Amino acid sequence: TKKHRIRIIHDMTRVAENAYFIQQKEKGYERRSIKEIVKEICSYTDGATMSAKKDALVNIGGFLAVNDWDVFEEARNMVVVYEGLHTYGGLAGRDMEAMAIGIGESVSDDHIRARVGQVIYLGNKMTEYNVPIVKPIGGHGIFVDAKKFLPHIKQDHFPAQTLAAEI
């Protein structure tokens, strides 16, 4: 990024799940905590955005984090116009506190193991009952393979939308 002056801003929305799969599947990460892996991921970027409604387990909010003072100043000046002061970004104190707690919980090895484990359990059960799903099973949801589930519906008749409407 320094050589070409192109900043990398990472969308951190599912970072805990990604860190979990790195921990489980990549050599050399087996003994590292989710928190350590997330910190390493962040070290490769110039900043990050996050919708806290996903991994941070809250119903509102998100954030922009940068490690460049000039970018911070520019963002701080813009947030006043759109969201409120930079100290709270339009969020109530209770929402910021919940987000802080949620971020901490989201990088807990026990939490993410249980959460991803539930998804894997559901995916395996669906497979056991011959429901065609997209594989490999991910960390936040199971996707029914609509083409295989409704093979009589041609692609140009939108099998996925048909399945969603029927459900």
Where are these regions (language model features)?
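Conserved PLP-enzyme active-site core in the AAT-like
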Residues: 1-133, 144, 154, 161
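Cationic-aromatic interfacial patches
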Residues: 137
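Short glycine-rich, basic-tinged beta-strand/loop micro-motifs
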Residues: 141
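Active-site loop ensemble at the mouth of alpha/beta enzyme cores that anchors a bound cofactor
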Residues: 147-167
